[in-house]
Swiss-Prot record:
It comes from Nitrobacter winogradskyi (strain ATCC 25391 / DSM 10237 / CIP 104748 / NCIMB 11846 / Nb-255). The lineage of its organism: Bacteria, Pseudomonadati, Pseudomonadota, Alphaproteobacteria, Hyphomicrobiales. Belongs to the universal ribosomal protein uL15 family. This is Large ribosomal subunit protein uL15. Pfam families: Ribosomal_L27A. One of its GO terms (molecular function) is rRNA binding. Binds to the 23S rRNA.
């Protein structure tokens, strides 16, 4: 047996159907698109159009609003913080704040500040300065002998002081 003798199994590679190549091909004339009209033409269908029936986005009620002044915190759990300390990304002896978390790569961006959450355990004695923290996170850090300082909300750079 030679490499040139090896062939694919019968039916493992199916030839693609070439549409619109005569009525004998089985996909000629209209090419599987049915008759005439909008759906037979090329181009985009009308999104959300349900054939005259009241579309779903109009049947459902409007709810809520988007608060343009909403502050979004970068959230970090205790287990993630402990992993970063174990890996050596963060020094437990220094003050841990938003800048140090971004610099170490633990948090990607902290535009509105950082919020500490209580999932997991913390073993190291830490000094943490964050813009928000859950009660369980504060309790866990203080149990390990550390302190949590809650900072005032961050002001936007463009906002007048």
């Amino acid at each position: 047996m030679k490499l040139s003798d090896i062939a694919d199994n019968a039916g493992s590679r199916k030839k693609r159907m070439r549409i619109g190549r005569g009525i004998g091909s089985g996909k000629g004339k209209t090419g599987g698109r049915g008759g005439k009209g909008q759906t037979a033409r090329s181009g985009v269908r009308i999104n959300g159009f349900e054939g005259g029936q009241m579309p779903l986005h109009r049947r459902l009620p409007k709810r809520g609003f988007n608060n343009i002044f909403r502050v979004e915190f970068a959230e970090i759990n205790l287990d993630r913080l402990q992993d970063a300390i174990d890996a050596g990304s963060i020094d437990a002896n220094t003050t841990i704040n938003a800048e140090s978390l971004v610099k170490s790569g633990v948090v990607r961006r902290a535009k509105g500040g950082v919020r500490l959450l209580g999932r997991g355990e913390i073993k190291a004695k830490l000094t943490v300065e964050v813009h928000g923290a859950s009660k369980s996170a504060i309790a866990a850090v203080e149990k390990a002998g550390g302190t949590v300082k809650i900072l005032a909300p961050k002001k936007d750079e463009g906002e007048a002081a």
